[in-house]
Amino acid sequence: MNAMDLSSYLRIQAHANALSNQRLGQALLALDADAWQAPRTSFFPSLARTLNHILAVDHYYIGALHGEAGLREAYAAFQPCASADAWLQRQRASDLRLVAFCAQCDPEAWVEMPRADHVQRDRAGHVLAHLFNHQTHHRGQVHAMLAGTAVAPPQLDEFMMPSEAHLRGPDMQAFGWDEAQVYG
């Protein structure tokens, strides 16, 4: 296993993000459409609205990391997922783009993000730190909202240490990943 450096950390975080979303998505599949849309206590007051917010923001920042144009327009045109299944499929595709980016990432590279009145420029490592924080923050809200349903919230934080491979085996298999891809 390689020593921990920033590039390794970002690669591990991208994988952890995808695995957490996969676990969360599998739990969400047990909900009916009413539970997916039901009003709940949170900043975005439903599972659907919170998860669609995560996905829309992911698309924006991952697009910026990849140097894509038209990000503000794409964000404004974002079409929310009508079901947990649709969200899981689209989130997985987004997560795989992020994993691919982090596998080759230069944390010092500049990233441009168009805003209403300027273009924000930050290093890729800083953008990724912000993105991972955003995902974790809102995923925690989803976890809390899920606790108010008939579906038990899944474990999201006790399976990513290198010594915990036995806790993530099925999750890794769902992506076709091995330990070397995550930890080097």
Language-model segments: residues:
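Helix-adjacent hinge/juxtasegments
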Residues: 69-109
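Short, contiguous alpha-helical
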Residues: 2, 11-76, 115-179, 184
